[in-house]
A protein has these predicted regions:
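Chalcogenol-based redox active-site neighborhoods
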Residues: 1-161
Length: 161
């Protein structure tokens, strides 16, 4: 787990990719859920993606069912929901665990030196966001209630726009 680009993740179709595919991009990595009170954030996340993708922003959504069982669907059902309801075109990945013994390696890496505002390394709820610079540095962890629009300035600074 030397750097973020060596991380291997599964796309929603279960094919493996390394995050090296996103080298030199600004990344916003989010654990997502379809039946959460914060699910509406998909719309604003897609808005950020539409506005900044050409400038180098990639959004990586990792469905997770660990918080109130709010992501019960299969990868196909999740993708259908996101595209039909929110017109999501950013990357959606395989459903994972973000806490506990079966935490996905990408989230072990993200949480390691980036505690929440309360000081916990655990992900506290759906829609926790990690902002990663073009050189792979984790810039900031944002809590679930941080609206995507509130991250806009940080994204613009990293993209130099």
């Amino acid at each position: 787990m030397s750097d973020i680009y060596s991380q291997v993740v599964k796309k929603s179709d279960m094919t493996d990719i390394t995050l090296n595919e996103f080298k030199n991009k600004v990344l916003l990595i989010v654990n997502v859920a379809s039946e959460c009170g914060l699910t509406y954030q998909y719309e604003a996340l897609q808005g950020l993606y539409n506005k900044y993708n050409e400038d180098g922003l990639e959004i990586l959504g990792f469905p997770c069912n660990q918080f109130g069982a709010q992501e019960p669907g299969s990868n196909e059902e999740i993708k259908f929901f996101c595209t039909e309801k929110y017109d999501v075109s950013f990357g959606l990945f395989d459903k994972i665990d973000v806490n506990g013994d079966s935490t996905a390696p990408i989230y072990q890496f993200l949480k390691k030196d980036n505690p929440s505002e309360s000081g916990s390394n655990d992900i506290e709820w759906n829609f926790t966001k990690f902002l990663v610079s073009r050189d792979g540095e984790i810039i900031k962890r944002f809590g679930p209630k941080t609206e995507p629009e509130e991250i806009k300035k940080d994204i613009e600074e990293l993209l130099n726009v």
